[in-house]
């Protein structure tokens, strides 16, 4: 997993900051968002970004086993649990999404974003001059 928005001169998008803060805490989320470093599967499980890690070559087997386990449980209970988790864990996401959209719009008008796009097109690393 890579939080690569910073590599394009942008803040996070699609509520990624909001979700990361809740999964790994604000300090780790800030580091991930600011560095754009890649995290492998094992790191994702250790930090709480993923819940299941499939062994090499066993993705389908692991997925089907989890699906079968979930299918054997009460779908009514699952629906209630999902509703409650989303309501109370992500309750203020709508306001966050609006704020995030305003920040991304502001970022996209900055020289850093233009430099990132040009660097991508020219297949080179961006050089940011903005302080």
Where are these regions (language model features)?
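Conserved N-box asparagine in the HATPase_c
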Residues: 123
